[in-house]
Amino acid sequence: MITFRSAGTRGPIARVPDDAMAKRRWPAEIIALLVAALLLGVGLTYVMTQYQRPSLDRFGISDPELITKSAKVQASELAAMKAIGITSVRLDADWGGVQYAGPKTFAWAPLDQVVRSAHAKGMSVDLIIDGCPGWAAKAGTSGDVSPTPASPAQFATWAAEVAARYAPGGVRMFEIWNEPNRVGFWSPKPDPAAYTADLKAAYASIKRAAPSALVISGGLAPEANDGTNINAVDFLQAMYADGAQGSFDAVGYHPYSYPALPDSYQSWSGWSQMDQTRPSIRSVMTSNGDAAKQVWITEVGAPSSGPDGVGRAAQAAALSEAIVGARTISWIGGLYVYTWQDEGTGPSNYVDWFGLLTARGTPKPAYAAVAAALGRCGRTHRCISRAADR
């Protein structure tokens, strides 16, 4: 998650010229159908059943709280997710949670259970390999919210343990860390060179344990260059400069755009920075020889309340627009909504309010919006292609 959207860069991010922007606009048939629907009063459900796109691999939910719930609740929530078209769940394989007691001790039970629950519902799993126990943390970070590994080799050993344990059971997708360009996830502050060293070591170890695995670089947040956090585009370019090419199969990205909608160009918007600004995530990938690789949106959403809240209607609109937009972009491999259920009701905590459901389990308008979009895809059986780790 990110705290604000005003993501600056070391140099100005310029808007791509109109002829290039045309490549990102919705297909004419979608626009025509939407206009017709508004004029005729036809529901959006009908409109979007007419548009089918087969190349997007996966729609999922990023749900860090699912692992904390009972097996019964997990089964119930996963069934509800699947009923609205969700086919995958993104979960933390938290090193600090599994090996908190030392390098020879493993507390696998909670992670084992949630992976079992997902597979029992026929859902694929994206495991985020992250976290760091105090005994393996870099000096001075062990007491931080997100301590960072002291040794890439030790982190790689952890990554190999995760891959060796879960790949034989069907997990094929591993994401290396979460938002490493944010101080909230990388202490004492983001360090592209240190992250890249961990990524390279983890990639090699995962591929030895599971050669067919899809390894995604840690989802980058559209932060500002404020002396602490690093803008996602700049961070990605620094990763390439530090030798990251060849050590990931896809780029992880979190294109949050609120309070704007995804299709509204804003130079600070994570969605716009994906490929509309100059430079952008895609332009950096292309200039470094990785145009053939995909971007995986491993988080996207908007808070319905709290200090950065956009309201329930705008939250629903943002998710609808993100899903529809992603289906029109060939280089997006998958999209994960953040998140299933509000984590609380704190008026001062924006993170509490991203759910499709309230903290009490009542569906918000965003639930219906996602259900409509993904239900349409499900009925065509074309929008969600292979489940790589089923």
Describe each PLM feature range.
Residues M21-A36:
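N-terminal Sec-pathway targeting helices
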Residues A37-V47:
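Hydrophobic alpha-helical membrane-insertion segments, chiefly the h-region
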Residues Y46-T87, D92-D94:
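Boundary/entry segment of secreted carbohydrate-active catalytic domains
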Residues D57-D63, V89-L91, V125-I129, R172-I176, ...:
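Hydrophobic faces of well-ordered beta-strands that scaffold small-molecule active sites
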Residues T68-K82, Q154-A163, N229-A241, A316-I323:
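Short, acidic/polar
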Residues I84-N225, Y258, A291, E343-G346:
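Substrate-binding cleft and catalytic face of glycoside hydrolase catalytic domains
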Residues A107, P180, P307-E321, G325, ...:
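Aromatic-rich peripheral "rim/lid" segments of glycoside hydrolase catalytic domains that contact
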Residues P152, A156, D191-A314, N349:
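Noncatalytic carbohydrate-binding groove/subsite architecture in carbohydrate-active enzymes
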